Amino acid sequence: MKVELKILNKELIKELPGYATEGSAAIDLRACISESIYLKSGECKLVATGIAINIANPNYAAMILPRSGLGHKKGLVLGNGTGLIDSDYQGELMVSCFNRSQETIEIEPLMRFAQLVIVPVVQANFEIVEDFSQQSVRATGGFGHTGV
């Protein structure tokens, strides 16, 4: 599938985004910043990526996810859990970074700090009803209803 990628900051030409291996599901996003950003414990900041994408197909979206190693080893996760990029958004990709560790985290210029994956989506046709046409076995069982 073709997704247009626009380089907004020429510094990124040194480190173009791409898949690390043939089996990679996501591309790494780099911090497109001129100097290091320091995140104190519990702090959240937006970090620029220097790129924009044009998915242009409403059957797909992009998701920004944390990099596993940084989240597990350093405590660098996303401030909003997951970043959802709609197919018609064409602005710069920004990443909300949150430090869940007790130590200050440094995000260095051009550091790989998040990842982007393209996923299929379905736009549902919602029908307003008084009652559901069928009741599931679970019905209204909510949080913890199947055990902890």
UniProtKB/Swiss-Prot annotation:
Alphabetic keyword roster: Hydrolase, Magnesium, Metal-binding, Nucleotide metabolism
Cofactor annotation: Mg(2+)
UniProt xrefs under SUPFAM superfamilies: dUTPase-like
Pathway involvement of the protein, from the record: Pyrimidine metabolism; dUMP biosynthesis; dUMP from dCTP (dUTP route): step 2/2
Binding annotation for substrate: 67-69, 80, 84-86, 94
E.C. code: 3.6.1.23
Catalytic function, reaction form: dUTP + H2O = dUMP + diphosphate + H(+)
GO biological process, one term: dUTP catabolic process
Coiled-coil residue windows: none
PANTHER family associated with the record: DEOXYURIDINE 5'-TRIPHOSPHATE NUCLEOTIDOHYDROLASE (PTHR11241:SF0)
Name of the protein in question: Deoxyuridine 5'-triphosphate nucleotidohydrolase
Lineage, uppermost ranks: Bacteria, Pseudomonadati, Pseudomonadota, Gammaproteobacteria, Thiotrichales
The encoding gene: dut
